[in-house]
Amino acid sequence: NKWGGNTGRTMSGGVEIKALDIPKKLFATARLFEEGGSLTIVATALIDTGSRMDELIFQEFKGTGNMELVLDRKLADRRVWPAIDISQSGTRREEKLLPPETLHAVTLLRRTLATMHPVEAMEQLTAKLGKFKSNQEFIDLISGAHVMD
């Protein structure tokens, strides 16, 4: 709120309406590079704090990201690593990043893991991945077989 100026207009949660202008401009710079490389911005957000302001700020910036990695305390408490909630994590526009056969395998894998509890999903995934020399071997298996049998 300090840097946003004082317009007298606030959003829910008590945030001055212009307070997020500077951070939004910073995140927008990642899209401004045309044929000049790229800019990667890594940001973190603590959510589910009960604060309307925290939730508002998170929702404002959620749409600017290309990827979300959601950590799960239940996984960490059980010492399941990485403590990632697979069903809530992902990259937008995967179809532009992955070849069609890999995208198909990843989609099948995600659908299967989404039916499981997050702890079970990560335990299954890490156990299965541990049996292969490379991620590509695992993807090749998924492409030609039933997932997670």
Where are these regions (language model features)?
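P-loop NTPase catalytic core
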Residues: 1-149
